Amino acid sequence: MAKLEILHFPDPRLRKRAVPVDKVDDEIRRLVDDMFETMYDAPGIGLAATQVNVQRQVIVIDVSENNDQPLVFINPEILDRVGEEEMQEGCLSVPGYFETVRRADRVRVRALDRNGEPFELETDGLLAVCIQHEMDHLDGKLFVDYLSPLKRNRIQKKLEKLTRQGALPKNIDRQHAI
């Protein structure tokens, strides 16, 4: 396994749309393993392949306290959204920033697992929010896109400055670093 480099906002590569995975093979499973290692090390609770500059529809998530419930979603598709909830979100690609975002409270999603087997999952709360957040990445969308242009621009300028200084913050609030 290998740790991958996480792209940071406003890197334009984060705006690229991911393409579906044609076949779940050893290369995809290796990517999944590397993504988990990268996510756990960051630390975070979710990571999309586009965040590590791989334009494939692959996300990994683990919202458990002990990093012992890893979930893999390949070619995920949301089938149903119910309700509305506001939750504080952060992002490994927008380190050090946490903002309130409104999303569906409950989702039903269909995807392939790490072996290419199809499955459906209906969930709510943090896992539902995390799935929606990561799926946004696959479409080139970031949680800062839900903020006002003024706030988004302020975050962008600050991160650009910190990047130039080599002083990007590390996400320390794992429960919100999606």
Swiss-Prot record:
Active site: 134
Cofactor(s) demanded: Fe(2+)
Taxonomic source organism: Thioalkalivibrio sulfidiphilus (strain HL-EbGR7)
Residues that bind Fe cation: 91, 133, 137
Superkingdom of the organism of origin: Bacteria
This enzyme's EC code(s): 3.5.1.88
The protein, known as: Peptide deformylase
Biological-process GO terms, alphabetical: co-translational protein modification; translation
Catalysis: reaction(s): N-terminal N-formyl-L-methionyl-[peptide] + H2O = N-terminal L-methionyl-[peptide] + formate
Role, per record: Removes the formyl group from the N-terminal Met of newly synthesized proteins. Requires at least a dipeptide for an efficient rate of reaction. N-terminal L-methionine is a prerequisite for activity but the enzyme has broad specificity at other positions.
Cofactor binding note from Swiss-Prot or TrEMBL: Binds 1 Fe(2+) ion.
